[in-house]
Swiss-Prot record:
<keyword id="KW-0808">Transferase</keyword>
<feature type="binding site">
    <location>
        <begin position="161"/>
        <end position="162"/>
    </location>
    <ligand>
        <name>S-adenosyl-L-methionine</name>
    </ligand>
</feature>
<comment type="similarity">
    <text>Belongs to the UPF0677 family.</text>
</comment>
<comment type="function">
    <text>Exhibits S-adenosyl-L-methionine-dependent methyltransferase activity.</text>
</comment>
<dbReference type="GO" id="GO:0032259">
    <property type="term" value="P:methylation"/>
</dbReference>
<keyword id="KW-0489">Methyltransferase</keyword>
<keyword id="KW-0949">S-adenosyl-L-methionine</keyword>
<dbReference type="InterPro" id="IPR011610">
    <property type="entry name" value="SAM_mthyl_Trfase_ML2640-like"/>
</dbReference>
<dbReference type="GO" id="GO:0008168">
    <property type="term" value="F:methyltransferase activity"/>
</dbReference>
<dbReference type="InterPro" id="IPR007213">
    <property type="entry name" value="Ppm1/Ppm2/Tcmp"/>
</dbReference>
<dbReference type="InterPro" id="IPR029063">
    <property type="entry name" value="SAM-dependent_MTases_sf"/>
</dbReference>
<dbReference type="Pfam" id="PF04072">
    <property type="entry name" value="LCM"/>
</dbReference>
<protein>
    <recommendedName>
        <fullName>Putative S-adenosyl-L-methionine-dependent methyltransferase MAV_0301</fullName>
        <ecNumber>2.1.1.-</ecNumber>
    </recommendedName>
</protein>
<feature type="binding site">
    <location>
        <position position="132"/>
    </location>
    <ligand>
        <name>S-adenosyl-L-methionine</name>
    </ligand>
</feature>
């Protein structure tokens, strides 16, 4: 179902269901022979949610049957697992580097089923603010506490739609805009219209003093190319039809959740406002972590740029 300006969701619907897909991919990577990451909570989320489209990543028996239904389906599924594994490793390392540098305020925008508050070795005094839809945060906290898990930092949930006045809600929850903070917008930006993307980074910029850090993965050049979009849509249509047979469940058309609009380049926008910026493409990040993109699968993943930045003094 196409997005609307005031749509909402729980963990099994629309954008919320993508968080379960990410958790399933993290579970598959964690349980693999040579994992890049360790997320012991990912499997808990997937099991708690029950059967759905996310099952295809986390069930090894389904993966072995994939190519019987559609040639290259298993390769595409493995590519998605690799995508999420490298993305997770990138953000894990970003957060830990910021913590090592002494930053003790962490803001995770569109937190979804990100369990970093619960699994990363945060230094004493760290406060993590997680922002997302109320039902999503409730599912995560309730599920983890039912399994006896405890956050490894002071966790402050801020249940809010990011299209609302989240800076006000964040500060009312205790965020101190006079101190450095580390921000993440992981797996978020392509679900925002271009204007909302601009507003998101304007708000982050306004709340960031020197020493603050930011990481995000954003649409790269070519994201809106009509020929590439057509190839991606056709490729995903075939894979989605086959995957639906495997899990006996409807598979969300993720193309309907994204906004393929021309956007302000986030890296240059940040540089103009006093941030030191580093970037890596999806292919560069995959290579950095020893993963590869299968031949012919380039169009199955949207062009993605990983951005990390630090606010300069002065």
């Amino acid at each position: 179902m196409p997005r609307t300006d005031n749509d909402s969701w729980d963990i099994t619907q629309s954008v919320g269901a993508t968080a379960l897909g990410v958790a399933a991919a993290r579970a598959a990577e964690t349980e693999s022979e040579n994992p890049l990451i360790s997320d012991p909570f990912a499997r808990i989320f997937v099991d708690a949610a029950g059967k759905g489209m996310w099952s295809i990543y986390a069930d090894p028996a389904l993966l072995t049957k994939a190519d019987d239904l559609e040639p290259d389906l298993r390769g595409r599924l493995q590519l998605m697992i690799d995508f999420m594994a490298t993305r997770t490793a990138f953000f894990d390392e970003f957060f830990l580097a910021a913590a090592d540098a002494g930053v003790r305020q962490v803001v995770i925008l569109a937190a979804g089923l990100d369990a970093r508050s619960w699994r990363l070795p945060w230094p004493d005094g760290t406060v993590v603010y997680e922002l997302d839809q109320p039902k999503v945060l409730d599912f995560k906290s309730t599920t983890l506490r039912e399994h006896g898990a405890q956050p490894k930092a002071e966790l402050v949930n801020v249940p809010i739609d990011l299209r609302q006045d989240w800076p006000k809600a964040l500060q009312e929850a205790g965020f101190d805009a006079s101190r450095p903070a580390v921000w993440s917008a992981e797996g978020l930006v392509r679900y925002l219209p271009a204007q909302a993307q601009d507003l998101l980074f304007e708000r982050i910029d306004a709340l960031s003093v020197p020493g603050s850090r930011l990481a995000s993965n954003v649409p790269d050049s070519g994201f809106t190319d009509p020929d590439r979009l057509a190839r991606q849509r056709e490729d995903m249509r075939r894979m989605r039809a086959a995957a639906a047979k495997l899990v006996d469940a409807e598979i969300t058309d993720f193309d309907d959740l994204w906004y393929p609009e021309e956007r302000t380049p986030v890296d240059s926008w940040l540089r103009e406002r006093g941030w030191d910026v580093s970037t890596a493409t999806f292919a560069e990040l995959m290579a950095r972590y020893g993963r590869s993109i299968p031949q012919g699968a380039q169009d199955s993943m949207p062009p993605t740029l990983y951005v990390s930045a630090q606010r300069r003094a002065g």
